[in-house]
Structures are given as C-alpha cells and as structure tokens.
C-alpha cells in the first residue's frame, strides 16, 4: 500500500514572482542589431549572433547544406584547427554553440563576464574566418548521412516528414527534411559549404 493518494493531485506551491529584465536594443556601427538583457545576479555573458542564412534559403537540390555548414563551423578557422579552437574555448571556460534552422543560423558563446573579450574574439574568428577543412566537412557529412539514414527508420521522423510534405506546397523548403536527403548531402563538396 502506498502512502500517496494518487486519486488527488498534489497541492501546488506558491507561484514565485519573476520579473523579466528589460531588453535593451540598439545597433552596431556595421548595422548588426543588438539586444541586451541583463541578469545582474549571474556573472555569465551569452552572445548570440543570428545570421539570415538558414536551410529555407537554399534551392531544393542543396537541401541540408546549411545544416552541414553550421555543424562544420566548429571544425576550425584560418588561424587554428578544430582541436586548437576547442582548447582555446575550454581554456577560458567558454561554450560555443551553432544551430541552424529554417530561417537562419545562430552562433553563440557563453562565458564568465571577465573572459568576454577573449570569447568574443573567438566568436568573431569562427564567424568571419572559418576554414572548413576537407577532413572536417567529410566527417560532418558522414554524421549527417548517418542521421538521415537513422531518420528513415524512425516512425516519428517519417510521420513528421510526411506531414511537412503534405502541409507545404511542393517546392517550398519547409516541405523537405531540414537535414536534407542522402542524395543532396552525399554530393556536397567543401567548396559548396
């Protein structure tokens, strides 16, 4: 016998007050939009750069290329290879993230506030001076192909892809899988990334 009466929902606790901080907006001299949200209790800074270069901007034969490009960004820059980049980030306690969606690619870095200048320099290096070494592009391509093959055996992924195909008009990027197809990804070259 259980001590809990599962026929009755548990009593909820008091709702805690949360005052979301004001978002300040501005623009950098180069035209980039700037949004700042300060949480003074945390000594952490997160910088998120959003590029309007997503999967939705690609023609059908190049499906999945934006995702592959985003995933390969962490593979190195013109100044350092992927291992050196990872070591530089780890050395300052920073975390780099890249995420590609339909509308754009987000490149972000999170770090303690006193290490922001170094982290920001690394973010700029990754964004402005990517190298896309062939070995890294090949590795990411193989990972993406494995994901595509795995999705072909996943009923949930197949259902989602079918809903998208039926919901969106033929030829729209949203009607195809965001990660691409085996034929579109297997033919991607380093020069196309």
Pin down the residues of each PLM region.
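Proteolytic maturation boundary segments
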Residues: 1-36, 44, 48
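Scaffold signal of the M16-like zinc-metallopeptidase fold and its non-catalytic homologs
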Residues: 1-7, 76, 119, 151-192
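M16/MPP (pitrilysin/insulinase) zinc-metallopeptidase core fold and M16-derived inactive scaffolds
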Residues: 41, 46-113, 153, 176-177
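Hydrophobic face of alpha-helices
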Residues: 66, 82, 86, 120, ...
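Sec/Tat-exported extracytoplasmic proteins
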Residues: 69-77, 93-96, 127-134, 148, ...
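M16/insulysin-pitrilysin zinc metalloprotease superfamily fold
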Residues: 75-79, 110-143
């Amino acid at each position: 016998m259980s001590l809990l009466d599962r026929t009755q929902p548990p009593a909820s606790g008091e709702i805690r007050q949360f005052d979301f901080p004001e978002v300040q907006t501005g623009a950098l001299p180069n035209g980039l939009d700037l949004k700042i949200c300060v949480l003074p209790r945390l000594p952490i800074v997160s910088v998120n750069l959003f590029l309007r270069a997503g999967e939705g901007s690609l023609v059908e034969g190049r499906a999945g290329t934006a995702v592959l490009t985003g995933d390969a960004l962490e593979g190195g820059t013109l100044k350092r290879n992927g291992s050196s980049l990872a070591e530089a980030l780890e050395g300052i306690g920073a975390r780099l993230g890249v995420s590609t969606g339909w509308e754009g690619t987000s490149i972000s870095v999170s770090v303690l506030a006193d290490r922001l200048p170094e982290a920001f320099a690394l973010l700029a290096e990754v964004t402005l001076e990517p190298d896309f070494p062939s070995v890294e592009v090949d590795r990411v391509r193989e990972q993406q192909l494995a994901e595509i093959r795995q999705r072909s055996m996943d009923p949930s992924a197949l259902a989602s892809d079918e809903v998208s195909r039926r919901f969106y008009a033929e030829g729209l990027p949203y009607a195809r899988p965001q990660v691409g197809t085996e034929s579109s990804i297997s033919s991607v070259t380093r020069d196309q990334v």
